[in-house]
Curated annotation (Swiss-Prot):
<dbReference type="Pfam" id="PF12799">
    <property type="entry name" value="LRR_4"/>
</dbReference>
<dbReference type="InterPro" id="IPR025875">
    <property type="entry name" value="Leu-rich_rpt_4"/>
</dbReference>
<comment type="similarity">
    <text>Belongs to the ANP32 family.</text>
</comment>
<feature type="repeat" description="LRR 2">
    <location>
        <begin position="65"/>
        <end position="87"/>
    </location>
</feature>
<keyword id="KW-0677">Repeat</keyword>
<feature type="repeat" description="LRR 4">
    <location>
        <begin position="114"/>
        <end position="123"/>
    </location>
</feature>
<dbReference type="InterPro" id="IPR045081">
    <property type="entry name" value="AN32"/>
</dbReference>
<feature type="repeat" description="LRR 3">
    <location>
        <begin position="89"/>
        <end position="110"/>
    </location>
</feature>
<protein>
    <recommendedName>
        <fullName>Putative acidic leucine-rich nuclear phosphoprotein 32 family member C</fullName>
    </recommendedName>
</protein>
<feature type="repeat" description="LRR 1">
    <location>
        <begin position="43"/>
        <end position="64"/>
    </location>
</feature>
<keyword id="KW-0433">Leucine-rich repeat</keyword>
<dbReference type="InterPro" id="IPR001611">
    <property type="entry name" value="Leu-rich_rpt"/>
</dbReference>
<dbReference type="InterPro" id="IPR032675">
    <property type="entry name" value="LRR_dom_sf"/>
</dbReference>
Amino acid sequence: MEMDKQIYLELWNRTPSDVKELVLDSCKSIEGKIEGLTDEFEELEFLSTINVGLTFISNLPKLNKLKKLELSENRISGDLEVLAEKCPNLKHLNLSGNKIKDLSTIELLKKLENLKSLDLFNC
């Protein structure tokens, strides 16, 4: 199923601001980016996009309350600086199984002042 269609199903009888957890694992990202997620998900605390085909995350909306972000098993190789701006309260980040090859890419995560755990297994 495509990512934006899964989000539509998750919203059944709810508004985006009612959603605290959103699991989009194995949904297909047609253009390699996050699709269907907007800054209306202002209460979102947990987002999982495991194995969805992401290549970049620059279009991630502002998610001030997001604490845990699962991005494993995608094709992300950069763009991580956007996380400090869009997800300032992020505590747990899983980037395992992506295409991060350069330590300078990870250096940008220093701006995530609340980050407690970072998974980079098999990058």
